[in-house]
From Swiss-Prot:
Transmembrane segments: 3-23, 45-65, 78-98, 101-121, 129-149
Source organism phylogeny: Archaea, Methanobacteriati, Methanobacteriota, Archaeoglobi, Archaeoglobales
Function: Binds tetrapyrroles and promotes the photooxidative degradation of protoporphyrin IX. May play a role in the transmembrane transport of tetrapyrroles and similar compounds.
GO biological process: tetrapyrrole metabolic process
Subcellular location(s) per record: Cell membrane
A Pfam family of this chain: TspO_MBR
Molecular function terms, GO-annotated: tetrapyrrole binding
Keyword check for Transmembrane: yes
Species of provenance: Archaeoglobus fulgidus (strain ATCC 49558 / DSM 4304 / JCM 9628 / NBRC 100126 / VC-16)
Name of the protein: Tryptophan-rich protein TspO
Amino acid sequence: MNILKLVASILAVLAIGFAGSFFTAQSVQTWYAGVEKPFFTPPNWLFGPAWTLLYFLIGIVLYIAWENGFWNDSRVKATFFTQLGLNFLWSILFFGLQNPLAGLVDIIALDIAVILTIVYIYHHSKASLLLLPYLGWILFASALNFAIYLLNA
């Protein structure tokens, strides 16, 4: 086990999440506080710990893919980094631009990218199963995003 690669992988993914949270934090207390939300909206305090755990798991998968040479499969590399980019972009669209419709389009693409990432990494390793909690969370977030769009359109 290469501890340096593991730490670098986890920190890289956490850094992307932290960068996205910059757009989120500014809007949670202002714009998002006034948005009509569905009954199944979790409390705001839950999002930080949930995302931290998920980014940690994503970082472990990044490490496993990197350490075991899965990057030689261009599909793994493309879908993995696409889903990270879409994840970051969602915070900008939904919170930064305060645009639930743009966020919805992005998160649907994110759902697809994560599913493909799981499938492509699974061909190499069952470590892709570490992404299942992430997929579950973003599918829930997709439903939440859709409901917020409908309630505020």
